Regions:
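Mid-to-C-terminal alpha-helical segments outside catalytic/metal-binding sites
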Residues: 1-6, 16, 24-50, 218-219, ...
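Histidine-centered catalytic micro-motifs
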Residues: 3-13, 163-166
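Conserved, mostly hydrophobic/aromatic
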Residues: 7, 43, 66, 97, ...
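Catalytic metal-binding/acid-base residues of hydrolase active sites
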Residues: 9, 57, 167, 200-201, ...
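Short, acidic/polar
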Residues: 32-42, 87-98, 179-180
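Active-site gating/metal-coordination segments in enzymes
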Residues: 50, 59-144, 151, 194-200
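Short hydrophobic/aromatic-enriched beta-strand-loop microsegments
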Residues: 77-81, 160-166, 250
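Catalytic pocket-lining loop regions of alpha/beta-barrel enzymes
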Residues: 117-231, 277-279
Length: 279
């Protein structure tokens, strides 16, 4: 079984060659950066073969460090890049977006109020349409409001959407974290909506194997099936051991078959993002 992590961050410290936006958008998850080499060491120890690099918000819209990692380790990494929808040549960039080596799609985040308002004001209609037209998959961070993906899925039925961290409230845990589950399950009727089952231990109040979240994962499995669920860690933010995050999907969750585990732990993501599995 080839294990692919659907989300990690790598980044460098703020420096002249790789400046961060000022003031910083938020705080990095670790001091001193997290390099591709460090990521590989942690992946190897956890039994993870490949990972999708999602550049973090604090570096701005730059994908340079992530693309450098792909160039150095093409068998280990690919990228879902950040994208500046306000760039003067934004539409032209999209036309050749997937021509970049190792680039699989785009990750968009909706956290700050001005950005969230764009989901409703129509200012991103051109972006959704262009991504659909060019076959660019999107990862979306919607914190506790999965229903915000519904109008997009309705209007752009051929656009592939992946909802990060199960579209849960990242600052909550236990029962409070799962309050949006009914709304997330309701979106399963849209065949191009997929769910990233990432950072799962962060939403648990119990030690490994985090049995308090198993029922929620079963609901997602019943609604979406194993071909639309993608395991991930977000390792630099992860509570608990990276290896345990993998092992829970390999050894626990007794409703999963061996074929299900293979899909959720990498094959389904590889198919969705057109990142063929190779040994």
């Amino acid at each position: 079984m080839l294990v692919t992590d659907a989300q990690i961050h790598v980044w460098e410290v703020d420096r002249p060659g790789r400046p961060w936006p000022q003031p910083p958008r938020n705080q990095p998850q670790r001091e001193g950066g997290f390099s591709a080499r460090e990521a590989i060491a942690e992946m190897d120890a956890a039994g993870v073969d490949r990972a999708v690099i999602v550049p973090p918000t604090w570096v701005g819209e730059s994908n340079a460090t992530a693309l450098d990692a792909v160039e150095a380790y093409p068998d280990r990494f690919a990228v879902m890049g950040r994208f500046d929808t306000d760039a003067p040549d934004a539409e032209q960039q999209l036309a050749g977006w997937l021509d970049q080596p190792g680039m699989l799609g785009i990750r968009v985040t909706f956290i700050a109020k001005p950005r969230i308002e764009q989901l409703d004001d129509g200012s991103l209609d051109w972006f959704w349409a262009a991504c659909e037209r060019h076959g660019i998959p999107l990862m979306m961070l919607l914190r506790g409001v999965p229903e915000q993906a519904q109008p997009i899925a309705e209007r752009y039925p051929d656009l592939t959407l992946i909802l990060d961290h199960m579209a849960l409230n990242l600052s909550a845990e236990g029962a409070a974290a799962w309050e949006s589950m009914d709304r997330l399950v309701a979106l399963a009727r849209f065949p191009r909506i997929n769910v990233k089952v990432s950072s799962v231990p962060n939403f648990s109040t119990e030690p490994y194997p985090h049995r308090d979240v198993h029922g929620h994962l079963r609901r997602l499995y019943d609604a979406y099936g194993p071909r639309r669920l993608f395991w991930g860690s977000d390792v630099t933010r992860l509570r608990g051991a990276y290896r345990d995050c993998v092992r829970m999907f390999q050894e626990e969750l007794d409703f999963l078959s061996d074929a299900d585990r293979e899909l959720i732990l990498g094959r389904a993501l590889a198919d969705c993002l057109n990142w063929p599995e190779q040994r």
